[in-house]
Amino acid sequence: MTKTLIIAEKPSVALDISRALGGFTREGDFFENEKYVLSSSVGHLLTLIAPNDPVKGKWSFAHLPVVPPEFDLAPTKDKRSVDRLKMLVKLIKRKDVSALINACDAGREGELIFRYIAQYAGQKKPTQRLWLQSMTQDAIREAFATLRADDTMKPLEAAARSRAEADWLVGINGTRAMTAFNSKDGGFFKTPVGRVQTPTLALVFAREEKIRHFVPRDYWEVKASFVAAAGIYEGRWIDPNFKKVADDAEQKESRVWTEAAAKSVVAACRNQPGVVSEESKPRFEAAKPLFDLTSLQREANGRFGFSAKTTLSLAQSLYERHKALTYPRTDSKFLPEDYLNTVRETIAGLAEGKGMSKGIAPHAATITKNGWVKPNRRIFDNKKVSDHFAIIPTMQVPTELSDAEAKVYDIVVKRFLAIFFPPVEWRDTVRTTLVQGHSFKTEGKAVSYTHLTLPTIYSV
């Protein structure tokens, strides 16, 4: 009887799969039952190399560009990775293994990790793809019931290989070219170039240049207190004829650029009566979109000071270890259109108030009671979901999290619930007080109507 080899990206994922499918016995670094052999990589095990690089060590323009006709693979230098690669190759070549399942992370890098291993093993056994959006046992079993055909993954494989090879070409040629340029007058000044690091460094450099060339300018603002029958209110002088200046962001309607001009406004208006006009407009504020990875990282940085790397690590832990969030490495802020029932069940679970959902349970219950989960293009849109959908909580509510994990889980859950509430209706009011030909603006806003939505959810 032949078996299928499942290769996950991390040992922890392999362990979760073994628990979800059941019946496995552990044999060192792999698991086995009557149907499957199950093991994992430990991240990237192989790296690209150019065969017989003829100009290694001769970094001059005469030997550029370096474009190999093909790329070879070489094991990384880490001993643990080398040992794991040997084991996986041995498992792939087992005579009783007739097929493979790629269970690496559902994304470009996960695809590349598996493809490199299979290529290095020199085997072309039939392959299927396990595509996990959540790490709960039910989600794992459901994903095994809907394995993807290998042909459907070819575009993702091509994208992954192209990215890796482009990185190599840009890095090798760019680094050698810039090093040769900076060393042309003698010496050796290695200048690394990379697809990501170089444009990122350019952003930092541009910002630093802007700071260094900034010329401070003094400006004045005139503020006034007005006495009315209902009480005292403040206004700020503005130029009613102001127009934005395209190349000078410091020009604003309330700024006066000479002290004399500011004092003349004060002298003209002090203790003088004013004529008031007022305009009010309704404004509807919907909840912010669901999180993708980038927006989650920005929110966590702004609220908690977490770095992008820290937030990703926490979200990955909530996904893999706690099974509390869906796949975090996503660039979509939308959910599939067939996800309505899953969302309803998830919100119903949060409404029970168990574990980490205790504080927000009443809000989840309000959504369920009012039937607010329904088709909505702001939330459910297949056209805006690619490989993965937005980051949302799963039906597995955690009971114990670290302080940092709890913070990330909390903002994801609140963003998830808030989007199902109706918009808040605000009334924005602009009051203009005209005194001796000078205009003073007073702005205010008040909630006209709300379903106890954004303010109360985010204050829990």
Residue ranges: model-predicted function:
Residues 37, 45-79, 90, 188-312, ...:
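Long, highly charged, low-complexity internal segments
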Residues 140-219:
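C-terminal or mid-to-C-terminal helical accessory/interaction module adjacent to the motor/catalytic core
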Residues 13, 109-113, 158, 162, ...:
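Hydrophobic (often cysteine-bearing) scaffold residues that line and stabilize catalytic clefts
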Residues 1-172, 372-373:
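Intrinsically disordered, low-complexity regulatory segments
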Residues 306-372:
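Extended, well-ordered alpha-helical scaffold/bundle regions in very large, multi-domain proteins
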Residues 21, 25, 120-125, 148, ...:
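A generic secondary-structure signal for well-formed alpha-helical elements
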Residues 3, 319-347, 376-395, 423, ...:
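Catalytic phosphate-handling regions of large nucleic-acid enzymes and associated NTPases
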Residues 9-11, 41-43, 105-111, 132-135, ...:
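An acidic- and aromatic-residue-enriched active-site/binding cleft used to recognize and process polar
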